[in-house]
Amino acid sequence: MRKEKEKKILPTLKFMLKTAVKNKPQLFIAYALQVVVSFSQTMVNIISSKYLVDEIAAIIGGGKAEEHIPTAIFCIALIVGVTLLAALINYLVNEIKNVYSEWFNEYFEVSLSEKVMKMDFEHTEDPDTLDQMNKAKEGMSWYSGGVVGILNGFFNIVSNGVNVLGVIAIIAVTCPLLLPIQIISLVLITIFTNKSNKLDIEYFKKLSKINRLFGYFFYQLSNPSNGKEVRLFDSKDMMCDKADYYSNETIDTFREKYKAQYKYMQYSNLTNGLRDGLSYFYIGFKALTGAITLGDFTMCVSSASTLYWGLYSIVDNIAATVKACGYAYEYLKFDAISDRMTKGDKSVSDGEHVIEFRNVSFKYPRSENYVLRNINITIKQGEHLSVVGLNGAGKTTFIKLLCRMYDVTDGEILIDNINIKDYSDSEYRKLFSVVFQDFELFAFSLKENIILDEQEDEEKLINTLKMAGLYDDAMKLENKLDTTIFKSYDENGTELSGGQQQKTAICRALYRDSPIVILDEPTAALDPVAEYEIYKHFNKLVGGKTAIYISHRLSSCKFCDEIAVFADDTIKEYGTHEELVKIESGIYSEMYNAQAKYYVENVS
């Protein structure tokens, strides 16, 4: 257990210190200043109080006031002056730390997002990775306090350590027996605190998963786009019940945690009472017997309190820092998730490209079942291929493998007789313009959603909008192409219809102008006539480019060069529309005959 803690604490603390030094080294000046101020204030208060009390006692005892008042006034002025100065410096330092805390929070949010965007795609569909990502996000933010939170704990240990050394020197001279009393009580309280902190870590892991599930249902309830389904299917109660369930799970877990920690809190309270009683008895006895002055009594009481709370603060901050490092370590664990996909460095040559699947089989990570088996197909430059099949036949998986979102389990995929693993990822993916059925639009302007990182070409953009049938709708918007999509971050934004959203996604693919274009059922929300028009325009625009169409409605089949029919985890039929439709009791012919009545007039 101890070695396990060290594996978390030391790397995390080292990482935090290194990150702070690299990005905001001036933060350490603020911490050093706070340490000096804390020590100065502690020593001034303890020592000045002794002399102040002794001077007042001398006056009360019949001494000449004029001999003692100046010293008393000086002590008061020194205490007040140092206190005010310390308050001012601490205020300024805390403001600086708050600013840096926000900066580091944003820094790690961006770093985590970049990690998600760069990691292998398979990780983004893995529940364990998603849970770890949630732990990383929570662990690096409010659970640990991030860089500033952990550095606060670290420098509190340093500051209190310096203060403790100062008061130990005072106590060793005046009331030496106070040292074992304070230390023994501290050891006991440390034991109780550690046991309580272990429960915090234990319940954190349990709460992290519950919070992710609760967050999902809360998002679904607050997401405006779910409004139609919730109302039409009267699912509000079901959604609320699920959200309430996980909310109650959270409350019950916290209640269970606090109940388990309660006894350790009571043990600590009892120890504190015994410590204070023994300390006051010892100091009071020395004062009554004349061994120390009244000022010494005050100094001993103050020193004993400072010693105990200094030691307690050291132990408490060590425990808190250990706990915080345990939380923040979840970020390091997430950041350490390695990619399994090999990274090539070959550049993609210009010119014609031939795609070849050779005996490709694939099963998803953590699954024993193959979703594709023995896929063999060659797609030549400029060929238009239609991929058809029932839901779950593996059509989208086929595209994911081609785009190298996953690596094949067996076999290989070649582009121009070179295994796609040998190509640079960024170079390879430039070959493709893809519109998936679960495409994502962003709360940016319509123009930005289409162009993304591509260079802006207004003429090309207008032509693309016209080809996709979105130009007229775009020109009717208040700010035309600069109109923000959705109202999430802009009250003047527009809510596009499902069909308009799909046309926008198609525009994005067309605008990229890649040599291989893929449409993975992006027109599901359109009616058959509109779908056919989109496909027809799209096919004209694609021209000599390689194109792969996936659609249940078979609208693209007649104008495609070849058709691949997926069923039973493999390609069951392959050929032209005319060839496949003639196969008696064939999969394609049955699908075509079942659907022909919906669009035969439009595609004839």
PLM segments and residue spans:
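Extended non-transmembrane interhelical loops and adjacent amphipathic helices
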Residues: 1-14, 101-148, 210-253, 325-336, ...
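Membrane-integrated ABC transporters
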Residues: 1-42, 61-75, 93, 97, ...
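ABC ATPase nucleotide-binding domain helical subdomain, centered on the C-loop/LSGGQ "ABC signature"
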Residues: 414, 429, 447-491, 535, ...
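ABC-fold ATPase nucleotide-binding domain signature/coupling loops
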Residues: 133, 370, 408, 414, ...
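An intracellular "coupling" helix at the cytosolic face of ABC transporter transmembrane type-1 domains
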Residues: 22-25, 137-150, 202-209, 219-222, ...
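Transmembrane helix-loop-helix hairpins at lipid-water interfaces of multipass membrane proteins
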Residues: 28-89, 169-200, 278-281, 285, ...
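C-terminal portion of ABC ATPase nucleotide-binding domains
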Residues: 480, 536, 544, 553-604
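Cytosolic ends of transmembrane helices, especially the final helix of ABC transmembrane type-1 domains
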Residues: 235, 279, 300-336
